[in-house]
Amino acid sequence: MKATIIIPNINGKGWLKDSIESVYAQTEQDFELIVVDNGSTDESLEQARSYCSRPNFTLIENGCNTGFSHAVNQGIARAKSEFVVLFNNDAFAEPQWLAELLRAAESDE
């Protein structure tokens, strides 16, 4: 596995699904996706749960808001790859985003 993508989430109902879909639309598919939910009270936790059957998808459910840094650190602790990428729950990635990011990370320049 080349990369772990971590999405911390709290009440991202309006964006989370599209954000996750943009990750799964990447041309580079050698990644795992970890969503860390920080006690969402909207429907975004249910949106995240709908991906649990996908390979290389992990959902960490915090019952309350443990804070952004703690959520990110939880994701990092579960990462199985050399490279870890933080991705906001309201961000949308172009299809080449991960491939280009990994190319830059792996280059000698």
Model-derived regions, located:
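Glycine-rich, basic loop-to-helix element that forms the pyrophosphate-binding segment
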Residues: 61-79, 89
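A conserved acidic beta->alpha catalytic loop
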Residues: 22, 37-46, 64
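Short aromatic/hydrophobic "clamp" motif used to bind/position activated sugar donors
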Residues: 84
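Conserved donor NDP-sugar-binding/catalytic core segment of glycosyltransferases
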Residues: 95-109
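Short beta-strand/loop segment that forms part of the nucleotide-sugar
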Residues: 31-39, 58-62
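Acidic helix N-cap motif at the loop->helix transition within catalytic regions
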Residues: 17, 42-51
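Short, acidic, metal-binding catalytic loop of nucleotide-sugar glycosyltransferases
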Residues: 22-30
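Cell-envelope/extracellular polymer assembly enzymes that use nucleotide-activated donors
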Residues: 2-4, 32
